[in-house]
Amino acid sequence: MRYSCPLPLYSVSIIAHLKHRQSLIKGLNNHLCQQHGNEIETSFADLGVSYSGLSGKTAADFGSGKPFITYLNVYSSNVIDETLYQYVQIGSKEKQNVVRYGDVLFTLSSETPEEVGIGSVYLGNQEVYLNSFCFGIHVTNTQKVFSPYISYYISTTQFRKFIYPFAQGSTRFNLCKSDFEKASFKLPSLENQKQIYESLKCFSDKVAVEETILKQYYSQKQYLLRQMFI
């Protein structure tokens, strides 16, 4: 007896649906930024205080200890994924910068200028550190910026165009951190930042739920396929 299984086609349909939703979120993010993004002029130097990642560490220090945020975690998500920490030994008298809620984190270098200064925002409350290939900004000026909104703003086309000129190099590109921090850019008003964030997060949460369902569906499909050939 031959078995027919429509699962792969359905799976492809779901993936296409999710990609479409993600594209819509990106487009909406850009549109709202263009519509409301000229209400506050500021800079990261005005918004907070910058700090470096881990220093003075050797390979022997990694693998256990305190959690730290990896380069890939910053690079791959607009909000730090708290399930992807790695670990490093931190001495009781050692001075290392701790990442705080609302901090904006950026990558310092990349092989292409387009990927320099990729950002992410930490929205957790755990004592956590930052890898040495990134830097962070403690946001202190909460009268001008709503940190959760920045997690969307830093992925807009407008912000990516703003950051490109600060990538310097030839074979490998590095972010000119001091110039980047002092450079002015424009944001929506604080109230609009909060409203835009709530709207975008609503869509993002729906996509996240659908991605979870897709993973569960894929596991179920694999189970059923195994049962067919027992």
Per-range role (PLM):
Residues 70-71, 90-155:
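A short beta-sheet element
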Residues 45-58, 72-104:
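Sequence-specific dsDNA recognition surfaces
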Residues 55-58, 127-134, 160, 167-191:
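A short glycine-rich beta-alpha junction/loop motif
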Residues 5-41, 209-230:
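Short amphipathic coiled-coil heptad-repeat segments
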Residues 23, 27, 31-55, 182, ...:
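Non-catalytic DNA-recognition/assembly elements of restriction-modification systems
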Residues 1-7, 189-217:
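Extended amphipathic alpha-helical segments enriched in small hydrophobics
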